[in-house]
Amino acid sequence: MNYIPTQTFYGRRWRPRPAARPWVAPPPVYYPPPPPVPVDPQAQQMQQLIAAVNTLAIRQNGTRTPGQQRRKRQPNKPKRKQTPPKKQNPAKTKNKQKPQPPKPKKRKPGKRERKCMKIENDCIFEVKLEGKVTGYACLVGDKVMKPAHVKGVIDNPDLAKLAFKKSSKYDLECAQIPVHMKSDASQFTHEKPEGHYNWHHGAVQYLNGRFTIPTGAGKPGDSGRPIFDNKGRVVAIVLGGANEGARTALSVVTWNKDMVTRITPEGTEEWTALVTTACILSNLTFDCSLPPCAPCCYEKDAEGTLRMLEDNVDNPGYYDLLAASTHCDAPQRRRRRGLTEDYKAYKLTKPYIAYCSDCGNGQFCYSPIAIERVRAEASDGMLKIQISAQIGLQVDGAHSWTKIRYMKGHDVEDTDRNSLEVFTTGECTVHGTMGHFIVATCPEGDSLTVAFVDKHKVRHACRIAYKHRVPVLGREHFTVRPHHGVELPCTTYAMRTSVTTEEIEMHVAHDVPDNTFLSKTGNKVKITPKGKSIRYNCTCGSKESGVTKQDKEFDNCEVSQCHTMVTAHDKWQFNSPYVPRAGSGKKGKIHVPFPLSNSTCRVPLAPLPNTIPAKNGITLQLHPVAPTLLTYRTLGEKPEHHTEWISESCERTLPVPEEGLEYTWGNHAPVRLWAQLTTKGSAHGMPHEIFSYYYGLYPATTVAVCVGLACVILLALSASCCLCVSARNKCLTPYALTPGAVVPCTLSLLCCAPRAKAATFAETAAYLWAENQTVFWMQFAIPVACFMIVTYCLRHLMLCCRTASFLVAVSLGMGATQAYEHSVTLPNAVGFPYRAHVDRPGFSPLTLHMEVVSTSLEPTLALDYVTCEYKTVVPSPKVTCCGMSECAHQQKADFQCKVYTGVYPFLWGGAYCFCDSENTQLSEAYVERSEVCKHDHAAAYRAHTAALKAKISVTYGSTNGTAEAFVNGESTARIGDLKMILGPISTAWSPFDPKIVVYKDEVYNQDYPPYGSGQPGRFGDLQSRTTESNDVYANTALKLARPSAGTVHVPYTQTPSGFKYWLKEKGDALNHKAPFGCIIKTNPVRAENCAVGNIPVSLDIPDAAFTRIVDAPSLTGLKCEVATCTHSSDFGGTLVVEYKTDKVGTCAVHSESNTAVMQETSLSVTMDGRGTLHFSTASASPSFVLKVCSSKTTCTAKCVPPKDHVVPFPANHNNVVFPDFSSTAVSWLTHTMGGATVVIAIGITIFLIVTCIAFSRH
């Protein structure tokens, strides 16, 4: 379902045209009013001045004297109609009616509100649940939209039966509007200039991308209401709000140009109207916010109130009932929340004494400030400590910042908060305290101690083994927040004591045995409660037992026969594993302050490195202040990823290949660099300069060519020498064997031999002409044939050396086409343009420019589960004295339960048992998601087929624009009247594996166990579908152990969290090692700007884009002169064209050769006959055909290599193995080969001549 509506009809409700009524008189003819008389500005100012003076005079005349008292203005009373008095019976008198207070007058809606109400009358409908309005649904475009969190059914029979599709990402439900209701829909717009907009309650301000209203203008129940602009178009739909003091920030769903956006400020609450929940008390159902008077509140009936809360602990309205039970003054009226209000729930609780393994002296004890739990989920290093004492409360439960209350025996006492100490290896900084909780920042250490001094000047402490290490935030170590740096997202414990989503369980305290209340006088045993509730059990006489608050005596009894216990069931205490559980298993709960919240933390920025560029590399001079992380990767198909922590000043040389390098230093943004084809020497100089030039670019090829050339020259010399020696031997051998023979003059000159008798050349030629003319002509044909063969080979060798080169910033240029339907193939690389020249008969050529702006490869994901850190919940053990207990299975993750017998001796420790045998302890433990799971969790997904979306910039003629479409061969995109279809892409590739893990903004390609098959200590040991669902699965190897004699506790063993282990061993994320330079992002998971494959594009160019030849300028005498040229460096060439024209205009510019590409797509033709253009090339001596309008010319240049070794932009290079030779290099090569060829030709010629002469002699 697309959540962008289609605008099909924007009118209000359609009304039929009234039928013709001939009997009704026609309306009068309308005459336009006369034109207004022009107003004189001076006369108008004079009239305003006279009116102001008259008004001032009237006010002065009505002013009272200084001594006159101001009379109170009486309200206007309606005059009663006077009636004649009636005779009244004096015996009967009427009771006087009490005057009724005037009803408050309703405020008249303002102009904005009236306008919105008029539009809302047709386009919004109420959503009702159990007859009560919970929100609204809105008709926008061709869709009906309703917030997903608004429960209920739309109050319309046609809309109620629609099938809605839900989007949890946008918190929206969407369905198609019935056809007969499309006229009621409102228009929508994505245009949102900053200013004021309208909604049901007045004005809405839009500033810096946020919608805000005055606090109090919106309320729960407004979810789903639209926000309109001044034209009545919907710009957003309200979902909720966040109170920010004087103003409230709205959470809305709005539209951008091509997508839906959800704006959710921090602390947003959903504005759905809450349906009143019902609580139960003794089969009586009542509103949770209005409990009955028995019990009405905690002060009137403490135990009854706790029982009522325990019975409704799982009710959704529990906290409403808790708040109402702690406010006995006026529970029905609205209460203003404050700091004191947040402490109200602690009236129902009390501190407690619990087991501590080290009370500061190396010995265990039962401490009033025992440490229950230490939490360190905050990424800024804060600790959240839970203790058994309560901070910020007095003895009576009243709020006081300066007090700590604690248990002393059976009584609650308080002392000064200033005596509170928290330290590890050093003193901690306490940021906030409330109830059982302390938030502090501590130095690193292996133990944690909390201590205080009571009012009797006795110091109480508790120390536990806790390894505290401050987490590294960002990519640089630091100990103190810097003055200057960069803000990174982090988590911290917010200093808020208001109601949160976290809670702790409470229960009624166990009865505490104490025989100090017993005394004996004579043969009587007396119980003196001393103001407490005492549970007694005496085995003497009639075996009496019960509960008393008064003194009580037993005759004929001994103190040893009676047992007394202090029972107090009017207070809750924390469900601690170090305190026995009460007899009843009921429990309550209260909120936990200081919730873990998302925030931003300032982290330092290391000094920027000094960079020294080199050929195909860069040297970084690093000077870190603290240990700083350096990472880099190449951007090719096989990325090489490296990570290193730098602690001291040093230098690191990084290779920069042609495909690019990305490095990240500390908390700075990533830097991308690309290598350029820089070299020494010159392609147009002397041979040694040419050798240096090509050796710097293509060392292997240059060496191979030089070695081959040297071999050819040596072979030529050797062959020529061999031929000469052979010819000499053939010439001289016959004369050497004949005595007295004289060598002819010709042979003596050719063979360097003394003259002998032989025929002369003329005689030999005459002899061959007379005897064998065939051999005579062969003497002349053989040298000519050799010369022709050598010339032909040299010609083709020069043509082969001039290979075609790739463009520096472009793919290959396309040829001309004869129709407006055009197909191109774009490289899937951001920043590389494509140019083409489209020819159409009767029209001037049209230059087409296309460039990929961005791409996004988004896979289809299926969530398997979410995993995070677990929390082990250990309830208070259930100690049964003189009896047995049995485990009851509970639907909890990794639930464990065991019963241990004989663990407590008679009257021992905190077990409070009076039997010396058959004392049992029931231990329980299970696993839950930790509170940090909402902020720190990993999601396991199965990735399917990925869809590629590309944004392409197109320029043709005078039209340019950007379009975005899926690259699938079907989706259509338009820019003006241009229609194009992208894809499918040539290479179906995705950087994502079939199974991926998403953690915050990082993605990992890794396998994971399926749901329900997690292993202890590994990824997936705790699994759930979402961070709030109840389907929690856990396998943590949780095992209960037998408690040791001497303490009340629940020992257990458990494998450490597999999620935390995975965080340490997860390795490098795909974000840092994705191939082809992909940028990996989340929400949604996608890979952006992956440079792989090609994108075919089918274009349908409109006829209006072409210019007829008769309208285009005509150019003659077109000439091209290259001013400067730097190859392989963006558009580093500049050329000047000269021409003659008959009129001014605009001509399309295009290079018809693949050697160069033009930066400009058109040239403004002027009567000056001169223009400047820029081009890009990868050739050292390019020669290309430039076409301007219908005229052509050839441009030739001699280019120099770029000077910068490394640049921050990508550039393609000539990647062929055999390089492109310059004309100068080819000239020198031709001369060298020609010299070797001449040497060989001379040797061959001599050999052939000698051979022919030898044949002629025989």
UniProtKB/Swiss-Prot annotation:
Pfam assignment, any one: Alpha_E3_glycop
Enzymatic class: hydrolase
EC code(s) of this entry: 3.4.21.90
A Gene Ontology biological process term: virion attachment to host cell
Residue numbers with lipid attached (S-palmitoyl cysteine): C731, C751, C752, C1252
Recorded catalytic activity of this chain's protein: Autocatalytic release of the core protein from the N-terminus of the togavirus structural polyprotein by hydrolysis of a -Trp-|-Ser- bond
Sequence segments annotated as region (Transient transmembrane before p62-6K protein processing): 731-751
UniProt modification remark: Structural polyprotein: Specific enzymatic cleavages in vivo yield mature proteins. Capsid protein is auto-cleaved during polyprotein translation, unmasking a signal peptide at the N-terminus of the precursor of E3/E2. The remaining polyprotein is then targeted to the host endoplasmic reticulum, where host signal peptidase cleaves it into pE2, 6K and E1 proteins. pE2 is further processed to mature E3 and E2 by host furin in trans-Golgi vesicle.
Record: active site: H149, D171, S223
Keywords annotated in UniProt: Capsid protein, Cleavage on pair of basic residues, Disulfide bond, Fusion of virus membrane with host endosomal membrane, Fusion of virus membrane with host membrane, Glycoprotein, Host cell membrane, Host cytoplasm, Host endoplasmic reticulum, Host Golgi apparatus, Host membrane, Host nucleus, Host-virus interaction, Hydrolase, Ion channel, Ion transport, Lipoprotein, Membrane, Palmitate, Protease, RNA-binding, Serine protease, T=4 icosahedral capsid protein, Transmembrane, Transmembrane helix, Transport, Viral attachment to host cell, Viral attachment to host entry receptor, Viral ion channel, Viral penetration into host cytoplasm, Virion, Virus entry into host cell
Segments forming domain Peptidase S3: 123-271
Disulfide linkage: C123-C138, C279-C288, C293-C297, C296-C328, C356-C462, C359-C365, C428-C442, C490-C601, C538-C562, C540-C557, C731-C752, C868-C933, C881-C913, C882-C915, C887-C897, C1078-C1090, C1120-C1195, C1125-C1199, C1147-C1189
Sequence segments annotated as region (Host transcription inhibition): 41-75
More about this protein: Belongs to the Old World alphaviruses that usually cause fever, maculopapular rash, arthralgia and myalgia.
Name the UniProt record assigns to this protein: Structural polyprotein
Organism name: Middelburg virus
